[in-house]
């Protein structure tokens, strides 16, 4: 071979190696799922179990037009998509289901009409993909009780549903399924068949419920994770509900990309009788979990209960979010400095300009998507202080929270944040405004208010 050709080939190969080394994965390695916190919309907070295909399509269209340029991409259908008689009520004992011949839930054709020909969610997923977005769904861990009662075969195996089921294990707040007996090969076979179904439907995101708390089911997490990986399709695995046990953080990180750190987060400032979770209460939980955030692993503070929670929210009456505007900014500020997944819960079709402004602030989103070293510096009963750094470039991100029911002025020396004592230039990321230089951090906040700043060492001209 001509030496010149050999030289050119060698140069090209070196370029490939250098380029490959700069990516999330190198040759021979799998790409990291969810390298940044997932961003999207989930149907639960607005529609509960009543969501219809027309709602999903319209929400996806709105997201593609208004939110996609800012990084929002997942459209997730939450609980109940396989229930054919929603009038029976939430998690009703007399619910009727749509099942295939292998004991797997399929979309109810009366609410997801594109599934009528046995195509499942594939037509809807393809439509969502055509908009440049990704498609997700919610499942309950385990196997349908109806599949066990009918002794249905498990696709791709010699087993039947009763071989996989642990009939002594039912989710304490949803009676639809039995848990799986993870000591039996049939359990893995069932989750394998479920994962193949999802891959065939072109699913990109699976939220699995009753698995990370109430109770924690580590073996089922492992089996489902293995099943999804075997499909060869990159599918984000999101674990619910919370609070996930902190001592299981490393185990969850091996098998999932997201896990809930609290009970359901709704539009309340303070928890009442432990449910739902209040925004204020997330400050302690986020502080505990911050060290466990990394590419592919994101402790999840739950959905953003902002905007219009209607027509049939999963908790409470139809309403506008009860969080004040200050509390809504505080929610987004905490979620971003903590690097939680950002999953909008409100009705996108009814999204007002204020809510849209919260979801399309590129400077705030950049903190969530591209920061490092995120940590709580101080958490007291009346305030909280967080610090992070941009992934690239100089400076820091600083968030200050007023947890008090009264306005207050908070002052911190820069050394209290572990920073060098000097002047820093300060930019307000919510207001897109330069605030000048400061020899200390001093903020005056309304009740439940917050600020999110970018700071850099001040250089005199």
Segments predicted by a language model, with ranges:
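Bacterial N-terminal signal peptides
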Residues: 9-18
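Structural recognition of the beta-strand scaffold that forms the well-ordered cores
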Residues: 38-43, 73-78, 83, 134-139, ...
């Amino acid at each position: 071979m001509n030496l010149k050709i050999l030289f050119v080939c060698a140069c090209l190969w070196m370029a490939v190696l250098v380029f490959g080394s700069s990516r999330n994965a190198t040759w021979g390695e799998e790409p990291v799922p969810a390298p940044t916190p997932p961003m999207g919309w989930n149907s639960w907070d607005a529609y509960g179990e009543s969501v219809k295909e027309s709602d999903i399509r319209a929400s996806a269209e709105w997201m593609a037009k208004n939110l996609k340029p800012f990084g929002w991409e997942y459209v997730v259908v939450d609980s109940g998509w396989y229930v054919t008689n929603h009038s029976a009520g939430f998690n009703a004992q007399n619910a009727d289901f749509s099942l295939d011949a292998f004991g797997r839930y399929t979309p109810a054709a009366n609410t997801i009409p594109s599934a009528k020909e046995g195509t499942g969610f594939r037509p809807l997923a393809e439509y969502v993909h055509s908009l440049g977005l990704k498609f997700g769904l919610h499942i309950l861990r385990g196997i349908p009780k109806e599949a066990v009662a009918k002794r249905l075969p498990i696709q791709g195996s010699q087993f039947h549903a009763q071989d996989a089921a642990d009939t002594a294990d039912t989710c304490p707040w949803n009676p639809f399924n039995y848990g799986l007996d993870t000591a039996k090969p049939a359990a893995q076979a069932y989750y394998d068949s479920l994962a193949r179904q999802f891959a065939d439907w072109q699913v990109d995101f699976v939220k699995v419920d009753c698995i990370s708390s109430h109770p924690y089911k580590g073996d089922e997490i492992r089996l489902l994770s293995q099943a999804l990986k075997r499909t060869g399709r990159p599918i984000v695995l999101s674990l619910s509900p919370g609070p996930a046990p902190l001592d299981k953080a490393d185990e969850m990180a091996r098998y999932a990309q997201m896990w809930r750190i609290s009970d359901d987060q709704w539009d309340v400032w303070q928890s009442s009788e432990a449910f739902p979770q209040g925004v204020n209460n997330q400050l302690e939980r986020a502080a505990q979990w911050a060290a466990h955030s990394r590419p592919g692993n994101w402790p999840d503070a739950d959905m953003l209960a902002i905007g219009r929670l209607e027509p049939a929210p999963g908790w409470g009456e139809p309403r506008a979010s009860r969080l004040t505007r200050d509390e809504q900014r505080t929610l987004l500020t905490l979620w971003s400095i903590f690097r939680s997944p950002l999953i909008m819960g409100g009705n996108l079709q009814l999204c007002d300009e204020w809510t849209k402004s919260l979801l399309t602030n590129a400077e705030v989103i950049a903190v969530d998507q591209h920061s490092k070293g995120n940590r709580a510096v101080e958490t007291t009963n009346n305030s909280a202080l967080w610090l992070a750094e941009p992934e690239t470039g100089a400076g820091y991100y600083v968030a200050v929270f007023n947890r008090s029911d009264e306005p207050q002025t908070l002052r911190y020396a820069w050394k209290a944040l572990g920073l060098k004592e000097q002047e820093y230039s300060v930019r307000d990321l919510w207001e897109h405004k330069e605030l000048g230089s400061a020899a200390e951090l001093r903020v005056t906040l309304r009740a439940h208010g917050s600020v999110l700043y970018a700071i850099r060492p001040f250089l005199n001209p």
